């Protein structure tokens, strides 16, 4: 698996985003970005460059 893949972590709870990013880093995935809601994530995804998304299913908005 490519450890340099670009991963977007989406969650409205900043602590959960940090936990997921730290777990990914422990697994060797350090090329990560964060979005705090679906709208921000959609904007980032439209710009391209992400290979994988880890997202919360239940967020406001």
Model-identified regions with their sequence ranges:
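Short acidic/histidine-rich motifs immediately flanking catalytic phosphotransfer sites
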Residues: 48-52
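Helix N-cap/capping motif at the beta->alpha junctions
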Residues: 34-43
């Amino acid at each position: 698996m490519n450890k340099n893949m670009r991963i977007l972590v989406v969650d409205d709870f900043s602590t959960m985003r940090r936990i997921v990013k730290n777990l990914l880093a422990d697994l060797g995935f350090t090329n990560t970005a964060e979005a705090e809601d679906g709208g921000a994530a959609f904007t980032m995804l439209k710009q391209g460059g992400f290979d994988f998304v880890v997202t919360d299913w239940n967020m406001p908005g």
